[in-house]
């Protein structure tokens, strides 16, 4: 599975309300750019802005997972 498909799958299973908005704000793009990126089938087809917002979105999801793991260790 390539990185683009992985992000699409994670969006369907892991994201919380506000994650897309937060990623768009951090990347400095509109939600339309995010939606456009999800419609692409190959990672090579992504523009720089689309790539940036998807990577930012992935970072948000990864940070949440890391935070949950840290809390589990503390408890």
Where are these regions (language model features)?
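Short alpha-helical "recognition helix" segments of helix-turn-helix
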Residues: 22-24
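Short, amphipathic alpha-helical "recognition" segments used to contact nucleic acids or chromatin
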Residues: 1-17
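Recognition helix of helix-turn-helix/homeodomain-like DNA-binding domains
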Residues: 30-45
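Short Lys/Arg-enriched helix C-cap and helix-to-coil transition segments
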Residues: 45-67
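Helix-turn-helix/homeodomain-like alpha-helical modules used for DNA recognition
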Residues: 66-75
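Short linear motifs centered on Gly/Pro in flexible linkers and helix caps
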Residues: 15, 40-44, 58
């Amino acid at each position: 599975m390539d990185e683009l498909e992985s992000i699409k799958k994670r969006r369907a299973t892991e994201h919380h309300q506000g994650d897309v908005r937060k990623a768009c704000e951090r990347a400095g793009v509109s939600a339309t750019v995010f939606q456009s990126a999800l419609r692409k089938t190959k990672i090579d087809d992504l523009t720089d802005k689309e790539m940036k917002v998807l990577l930012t979105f992935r970072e948000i999801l990864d940070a949440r997972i890391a935070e949950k793991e840290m809390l589990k260790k503390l408890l």
